[in-house]
Amino acid sequence: MAANKREPKVVVLGGGSWGTTVASICARRGPTLQWVRSAVTAQDINDNHRNSRYLGNDVVLSDTLRATTDFTEAANCADVVVMGVPSHGFRGVLVELSKELRPWVPVVSLVKGLEQGTNMRMSQIIEEVLPGHPAGILAGPNIAREVAEGYAAAAVLAMPDQHLATRLSAMFRTRRFRVYTTDDVVGVETAGALKNVFAIAVGMGYSLGIGENTRALVIARALREMTKLGVAMGGKSETFPGLAGLGDLIVTCTSQRSRNRHVGEQLGAGKPIDEIIASMSQVAEGVKAAGVVMEFANEFGLNMPIAREVDAVINHGSTVEQAYRGLIAEVPGHEVHGSGF
């Protein structure tokens, strides 16, 4: 008789809405431990099967999910690590993880952002801090609250090793949460970072009362900008019309639960960006990504009017009205091969 194989333990690092949602999904598939900084949140998850701070009182988590504030405990028992911490804290957590984690444990990022200062994608940081550990990203049109409430959704798991990606995808998959695989890590990560910037642009439009046609125009042209930069950075063109690109772009631009759309709306209401950030309980990655995206655009010689106008509002004192006037001033050219808005 064959010996029983131990089920791999998934360790999710981070206590926000999406990290908790993914942890609850994984706990329904196998042993899962979630590391959180807050003892109150850990107790809420363990005793009440809820993360009331980020998901409210109505979302009930898997009763097999356990939370801890002991980082060493979490790191030492991990067979798979899922990174749910924001981009600004991502590297620091990985550095601490490197002191405890055994070799070759796969590390999957949930973060759709770029590191300020280095302009690195999250998988690049994983490879730098944890060499030898397979790195991937899980991304797609995933509003955390909807997934946690059981609405049907899908994501794509991007890893260079498709055999490993196929094995790991089963840990995230449920009847209502479909998980596809791809080897285009660059494309998926680039799309995830860019869509946040474009959602801010659409949010600014909502604040101005623009029509549905105008919103569709901005989203469609945003997809072109996303694809141009993503391909220039090494992504595959076919990734961007998919879940991580167009799918995530649509939901982040249109959902009332979107943090980045909210930032755009608040900018349109005349609030300073620092005040908006301070009032939010979770991170809107598009705020930090806007300047980084423009650095890449300049590096590759690309005209990205939507990203440029968002960066101008967030970092250079422009107004929402000036941003949309700037877009309209762009002369339209060839829809596919043109360089303007």
From Swiss-Prot:
Sn-glycerol 3-phosphate binds at K112, G140, K195, D248, S258, R259, N260. One of its GO terms (cellular component) is cytosol. It is found in: Cytoplasm. PROSITE patterns: NAD_G3PDH. Its EC number is 1.1.1.94. It catalyses: sn-glycerol 3-phosphate + NAD(+) = dihydroxyacetone phosphate + NADH + H(+); sn-glycerol 3-phosphate + NADP(+) = dihydroxyacetone phosphate + NADPH + H(+). SUPFAM superfamilies: 6-phosphogluconate dehydrogenase C-terminal domain-like, NAD(P)-binding Rossmann-fold domains. The active site is at K195 (proton acceptor). Keywords: Cytoplasm, Lipid biosynthesis, Lipid metabolism, NAD, NADP, Nucleotide-binding, Oxidoreductase, Phospholipid biosynthesis, Phospholipid metabolism. It comes from the Bacteria. GO terms for molecular function: glycerol-3-phosphate dehydrogenase [NAD(P)+] activity; NAD binding. Pathway: Membrane lipid metabolism; glycerophospholipid metabolism. Catalyzes the reduction of the glycolytic intermediate dihydroxyacetone phosphate (DHAP) to sn-glycerol 3-phosphate (G3P), the key precursor for phospholipid synthesis. Belongs to the NAD-dependent glycerol-3-phosphate dehydrogenase family. HAMAP family: NAD_Glyc3P_dehydrog. This is Glycerol-3-phosphate dehydrogenase [NAD(P)+] 1. The gene is gpsA1.
